[in-house]
Curated annotation (Swiss-Prot):
Function: Transfers the 4'-phosphopantetheine moiety from coenzyme A to a Ser of acyl-carrier-protein.
Cellular compartments annotated: Cytoplasm
Entry similarity comment: Belongs to the P-Pant transferase superfamily. AcpS family.
Full protein name: Holo-[acyl-carrier-protein] synthase
InterPro entries per record: 4-PPantetheinyl_Trfase_dom, 4-PPantetheinyl_Trfase_dom_sf, ACPS, Ppantetheine-prot_Trfase_dom
CC terms in the record's Gene Ontology section: cytoplasm
E.C. number: 2.7.8.7
Lineage: Bacteria, Pseudomonadati, Pseudomonadota, Betaproteobacteria, Burkholderiales
Main location group: cytoplasm
NCBIfam families: acpS, pantethn_trn
GO process terms (BP): fatty acid biosynthetic process
Length: 142
């Protein structure tokens, strides 16, 4: 495997909370995929703060992923096309759907993600890998 790209993002939890409040909850529905949305509602029902922290980590993960694959938030990378879920062990992993999944498969791209939150910040880091041969390093003459 070769590294296709890396991406990182940091989100301010209080800003995510403010947007969520201002939109009456629609922000979560716009950003989260169906499985993420179920987890968000369950966590928020137990603790408002943990629900918002979850939303912030998922927002951050999507931003980091979009950077790692080099598209930013442009087709086929859409908010709901990528979900960050957790294995029973707690380890996060990404799941792509629709045209994004097709785009990634055509390029042999897989990704690893890590997320963390502490008080007012959520941070994510993504390493996108490909099974394609690595590109040669560009050299300049001296």
């Amino acid at each position: 495997m070769a590294i296709y790209g890396i991406g990182t993002d940091i989100a301010q939890v209080s800003r995510i909370a403010a947007v969520l409040e201002r939109t009456g909850g629609r922000f979560a529905e716009k950003v989260l995929g169906p499985d993420e949305l179920r987890v968000f509602h369950a966590r928020r029902a137990r603790s408002e703060a943990r629900g918002i922290a979850f939303l912030a980590t998922r927002f951050s993960a999507k931003e980091a992923f979009s950077k790692a694959i080099g598209l930013g938030m442009h087709w086929p990378m859409t908010w709901r096309a990528l979900q960050t879920l957790n294995h029973p062990s707690g380890e996060p992993y990404v799941v792509a759907s629709g045209e994004l999944a097709d785009w990634l498969a055509a390029r042999g791209i897989t990704a690893r993600v890590t997320v963390s939150d502490e008080r007012d910040y959520a941070v994510s880091f993504v390493v996108a890998e490909t099974d394609a041969a690595p590109a040669p390093v560009s050299r300049t003459s001296s």
